[in-house]
């Protein structure tokens, strides 16, 4: 598992959650990934940025192998409609570009599976919660999210919030 994040703290967290290699940018990851995969590149590339830009698509497709899949989960602006990619390589290498939200599955099917993984200790949800906030401090949570200080921040509601 290769994780790419400009935030050093988040790269450290990625290693704790199972990443074997981390890089600060897609550009800095290309050469090591070529070496690591003997030029084959990644079967699956998942773009999960907070503010998706069309320019990320071509970089991510560069990291994607022939017949591989690049999945976009990050949300961009509805006004950002430009995506740059090499159509020749995209077609000739038979790559797939897929949009995705919430894993693309059915919540009725996937939720019981995820709960089972959580109960068995294989899905580490509690460890991903780095900070809890009261409703009164929701703005602090939002600021911490924008500053890259959390893996996940959680708003804890109390009876007084109702």
What are the roles of these predicted feature ranges?
Residues 93-100, 123-124:
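Short, local alpha-helical segments
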Residues 75-78, 102-107:
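Short coil/turn segments
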Residues 2:
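Conserved beta-strand positions in the Rossmann-like core of class I SAM-dependent methyltransferases
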Residues 9:
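Conserved Rossmann-like nucleotide-cofactor binding loop
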